[in-house]
């Protein structure tokens, strides 16, 4: 099977994306691993990325973001977080996950022992306010749909609290 052919239609506009851990391995079950993502988001936001909505679940995250070169910025985000997360797994001797990452990596990833993220992010261009609202609702209700919480604002690793006027873990851009 070939590499992902999903592309960013217009890399300067907001896109809905899904970033999934290889083989859907549940890595984001520890606050330390989620904090690596938040640190990386904050860095990218300081570099100019706008984050409109997000949710982090145990093995993937959904995101609506925009930057001047979103395709390149998401590639940087994935590369940096992969190195940090693999480093965390190694430092904490979480060998079962490391072995699984190694056994499921793509053949062309021969220059490194582990692949962390699945290829591609399935970017969808957000065209108009109705689509933006629909995607934000989808993102925020993901943990509810999975039965993890009864209300979207109860999921800690989501921008739902921010949209409800409460403090969230990441500053979100509400204007698009």
Identify what each model region corresponds to.
Residues 1-176:
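Short catalytic/metal-binding and nucleic-acid-binding patches
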